[in-house]
Amino acid sequence: MSQIVYYSKLVTIVFFSLALQLEARLLKPTKNGEEKEVLIINDKRRLYYPIRDGGLEYSVKGPSRIEFISRYPVLKGKKKSHAFKYRILLDGDTISVNHKYKVQRTIKSVQHPRHKYTYSGNYFINLQEGTHTITLLPINDQKYPVLIRLISKEFESLRKDKIFLKPMIH
């Protein structure tokens, strides 16, 4: 057998072993998650939840890294950048998230075909061990609700030669 065959098998095995370690899962709201928006992004269906007046509440077990992926709906004719924002309540602490992105033309909505959506605004939070409550609240000076999805990724285990750095907040 040639070395090319062995090399391609080795690359495949390494790729799948890395993919299994970096598994991410979509989090579903535990409260007020009945309303959903299905967006088609690169021929894949992605589930987003609008942040309405009641907010969205999630219960998450740590340690994990939470990714907040948000988009803002815009009518089809608009092309400029659009600012949108929301608030995160994490175990009683408040974080205000502000984004400003251009409209991405390739995204379509099943429920709202006359809307386009901005590029995604991503925000990350690392959670320590334990159970955490995350509440997402709207900021009311916006015309449309912000659409959001939360993805949870587990941390890889620390080896003896790695050091965990903690940021200092003043």
Residue ranges of model-derived segments:
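Glycan-recognition and processing domains
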Residues: 24-59, 74-77, 105-115, 151-170
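Beta-sandwich interaction modules
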Residues: 113-127
